Amino acid sequence: MTTAARKTSTVPQIPKREGVKSGLPEHLAETRSTKLKRIYSELVKEFGAQGWWPLYDIQSRQLIYHPHDFTYPKNEQQAFEIIVGVVLAQRVTWKQAEAALKRLAAPSILDADRIAGITVNTLAEFIHGCGFHNQKAATLKAVTEKWLELKDRYKEMSVGDLRDAFLSVKGIGRESADSILLYALSKPIFIIDEYTRRFLKANFDFAAKDYDACRTFMEDNLERDVRLFQEYHALIIEWGKRNRI
C-alpha cells in the first residue's frame, strides 16, 4: 500500500546488534522481540507518531492524520471510510487514492448505503483517475455489501472469521483484508506489504516472501496490541520511503 508523503528528515541508521555475530556470548544476544522493540523506539523518536488512518474532514476538505489519538475510528461511518480508502489505495500512490476519496466525499457518496444504491458504472466515474477504477468500483460495491452484512456483529467475531469474510470479497487480498481489520475494525493483526518485507530483510536477514510467514514473524515477536501494530506498520512505511528502499 502506498501512502501520503511527509516532510523529509534524516533517516535513522538502525545499527545491527546481532549479539552472536558481533562476538557477544549467545546468552547476551539481542532477541528478535527485543530488537523489534528497540527499532520501534528509534523510529518513533525519529519520525514521531504517525496517526494512521487519515480521515476526511468536512470543514477543511482534507484528509487528516490523528497522531496520539487512538480513539479513531469513532463510528461506523469512519470505519467504512477507511475500508473505502484501503480499496482505493491498491496499486496506486496515496495522492491518487486521496483525490478519489475526496471526490466521493464532496457529494456525500462516501456512505455505505449510498454506494450500495448506485451502479458500478456510476461509482467508477467518481473514482476515475485512481487507477483500475472499473475494477475498484466493483470491489467497492462488493466490500460495501460485506460491510453492511457484518457491521452489526463484527465486534463479536474472531479475527480469523472476520479476515476470512473480507477475503471472500473479490478484489480483497491479504494485505487489504488485514488493513481493514487493523485500521477500520481495530483488530490486532499485522499488515505485511513490500516495505515490511524489505524491513525484515534489512534488519533481520529474514527473506521469506510468504505473506503469512512474515506476519507470523511480526506477531510472534511483538505484544499483540492494536495501537502498536498500527503505529509500527506506519513507521515501517515511513522508514522505507525515507531510505528509498
Where are these regions (language model features)?
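N-terminal polyanion-binding entry modules of DNA glycosylases/AP lyases
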Residues: 1-156, 224-228, 232-245
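Short amphipathic alpha-helical surface micro-motifs
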Residues: 22, 65, 172, 215-219
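Short, conserved alpha-helical segments within structured domains
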Residues: 80, 119, 136, 158-162, ...
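Catalytic DNA-binding helix-loop module of base-excision-repair DNA glycosylases/AP lyases
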Residues: 85-88, 140, 144, 157-206, ...
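Short, well-structured alpha-helical segments that form the helix of a local strand-helix-strand
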Residues: 115-119, 123-124, 162, 166, ...
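Hydrophobic secondary-structure block in the mid-to-C-terminal portion of proteins
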Residues: 196-245
